[in-house]
């Protein structure tokens, strides 16, 4: 086993994984038999609970871990619900549970879920869809590789964008990565 720590960004890990909500047999996301997920250690590109488990894992061995919400996508925050005027969604055929994307004041893309709507208002949920969920991962570390200074610098600019990004654009919480059924390619 190699010795890694979250503060030392010098290597990238390559993993295969599948994730389920604890107690469910439904796979939420998986890259098994697909391209490996690669992330820079310590760059906040995947959820912290999975990153910690990867650092302790044996290369080539399947591991299983249960990750609490606090080390995954955070606890569900009722304060992340917002009622907005329906006219802000003009031209959009709304459905309960649909994902919508917007921009924050600092031009960051943010994902939200339509919880409910009426003729005059829409209830928008800015929690990550997996907030409050305990996740069960099965994963295998395929290997580690050294990263260049350019990759380290780029990871600071990319962190927080997209599914595997640090904050993932999901309410500004720590976390990101694996489990939200996004494309990782």
Curated annotation (Swiss-Prot):
Q: What does this protein do?
A: Folding helper with both chaperone and peptidyl-prolyl cis-trans isomerase (PPIase) activities. Chaperone activity prevents aggregation of unfolded or partially folded proteins and promotes their correct folding. PPIases catalyze the cis-trans isomerization of Xaa-Pro bonds of peptides, which accelerates slow steps of protein folding and thus shortens the lifetime of intermediates. Both strategies lower the concentration of intermediates and increase the productivity and yield of the folding reaction.
Q: Which family does it belong to?
A: Belongs to the FKBP-type PPIase family.
Asked whether the UniProt record includes Metal-binding among its keywords, one would answer yes
SUPFAM superfamilies assigned = FKBP-like
Reactions accelerated catalytically: [protein]-peptidylproline (omega=180) = [protein]-peptidylproline (omega=0)
| Classification of source organism | Bacteria, Pseudomonadati, Campylobacterota, Epsilonproteobacteria, Campylobacterales
UniProt: Ni(2+) binding residues:
163-164, 178
Q: Which gene encodes it?
A: slyD
| Name used for this protein in its record | FKBP-type peptidyl-prolyl cis-trans isomerase SlyD
What GO cellular component term, any one, is given? cytoplasm
